[in-house]
Amino acid sequence: MCKGLAALPHSCLERAKEIKIKLGILLQKPESAVDLVIPYNEKPDKPVKIQKPSLDEALQWRDSLDKLLQNNYGLASFKSFLKSEFSEENLEFWMACEDYKKIKSPVKMAEKAKKIYEEFIQSEAPKEVNIDHFTKEITMKNLVEPSPSSFDVAQKRIYALMEKDSLPRFVRSEFYQEFIK
């Protein structure tokens, strides 16, 4: 640690860490310049205001990953927390699977399935999720003919992992604790 930071009171350093975590999602760059382009004939959508949940809603997150993931503010908070721990791949996989299930076109479904597989499932994938060999095999077999349920087994395993591991860490984090004060 540099001498300048060592001279600061511990509470200042802790507050700086909290701010970094809370702003983490805002500091991300778009994945490509295409994300910044607005098509000529479309009007940009009004930004969705994420309303801060009530204390009661936030307290329910402790016991229910479903409630956390269904709340836009909770989802954004959870994602920021996981990014701060460099462990966001499970949530990103779960979200990609949710988006995948909404696809109607068989061609687009096959393309998205391939992308999800290459990004999260295959060995040495850039964001490889931690699933057992049996689950990988089932998922690979399901992808021979992609359907909305192709990733269900893997998604359920990852959900269980987040529920057992990530959610308790999030609930114990200063980020969540500050929020419910």
Curated annotation (Swiss-Prot):
InterPro entries: RGS, RGS_RGS5, RGS_sf, RGS_subdom1/3, RGS_subdomain_2. Residues 64-180 form the RGS domain. Disulfide bonds: none annotated. Gene3D superfamilies: 1.10.196.10, Regulator of G-protein Signalling 4, domain 2. SUPFAM superfamilies: Regulator of G-protein signaling, RGS. Transmembrane segments: none annotated. One of its GO terms (cellular component) is cytoplasm. It is found in: Cytoplasm; Membrane. SMART domains: RGS. It holds the Pfam family RGS. Keywords: Cytoplasm, Membrane, Signal transduction inhibitor. The keyword Membrane applies. CDD domains: RGS_RGS5. One of its GO terms (biological process) is negative regulation of signal transduction. It comes from the Eukaryota. Inhibits signal transduction by increasing the GTPase activity of G protein alpha subunits thereby driving them into their inactive GDP-bound form. Binds to G(i)-alpha and G(o)-alpha, but not to G(s)-alpha. This is Regulator of G-protein signaling 5. It comes from Sus scrofa (Pig).
